[in-house]
Amino acid sequence: LPPLDEAYLEETLLQLLAIPSPVGLTDAVVRYVAGRLDGLGIPYVITRRGAIRATLRGQERHPARAIVAHLDTLGAMVRELKDNGRVGVVPIGTWSSRFAEGGRLTLFTDTQQIRGTCLPLKTSGHAFGDAIDTQPSSWDHVEVRLDHPLASEADLQAAGVRVGDWMAFDPQPELQPGGYINARYLDDKAAVAVLLTACKALRDSGAELPVDAHPLFTITEEVGSGSSAALHGDIAEMVSLDIAIAAPGQATDERAVTICLQDQSGPFDYHLSHKLIGLAQSFGIEHRRDVFRFYRSDSAAAVEAGNDIRTALIGFGADASHAQERTHLDSLRALGRLSVAYLMSAPVARRDSRNLPNSASVAVSRLRTLGCPGRTVSEHPQYSRNLPFGGS
């Protein structure tokens, strides 16, 4: 396989983490990734919603494939201007207020940025004693203290703070000499850095791809819509790159790539998933198989939007997802190598390049079949022919 530029990987990850990108405030990170693609000479388009669809030309146009990572992160938004000069908070995405408490952040007004800290309603042990340990932990029990002379709602208004202002928490990245990486928002900026590095490896090596591949960078994965508007009907198979969950009861390892066989939306495509397992085995890539019960990704968004595609999920192993996340460079290397191997491999099924009738015409055909006296669905030619099994 073409080698990965690990210096590029680390540099890209740190630069991505330095750009605030909570869902809805992603223009800056989109511009950054577009610049990275420009530097690699990879053409792309930006959708109306702001996602990036790049193109790596292959020897054949069809069946085209996509490989996707998301640029958006968790965050928060102002929901209330309080009489004490602080602001109430609502989360962007799904995460616990436990991991917001004590976090430094930037609040984005319409005209300026204000630094601040997210704190429980009762913070000082000198003032509240044991009450700081018995207060509930929820978004209703935290507030943001802004580093500005503010003592009332009127002061907040005068400073330009409004309900609906975005807040981005500091990522606090730390790369250890032993390879461990700690930061908020490794989900999914670590995978974005890996995907860009994989693209660089392919460009630097001049490797020929068998079919067109479209690296996708989505901007609303954390709120569920993700890749739903980034596919154009020409994609036959899509692999999502995302965080994999290292926790008790899970098989994921922080130093390997995970191939997920099922998440809360159901099983991923059997043939595509097992192709990825086979590639990992063939190239000696350290990997784990896992299932995630409380998890969804861009793959689910694509299928729910009505796309007729095969989907799979591979990820970097990370501890404490949606909190103070930690992964290891070994896992990012493994994810990168598997991504390159996948992009250089043949399609899962050549028959996926055929244009199939749209869902409406199939539905009409099925209804007509069911309405024919003396003829069952199983007797209709459309349903009785033997379909190939596997990737044939």
Can you annotate each of these PLM segments?
Residues 1-392:
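N-terminal hydrophobic/helix-forming segments and targeting peptides
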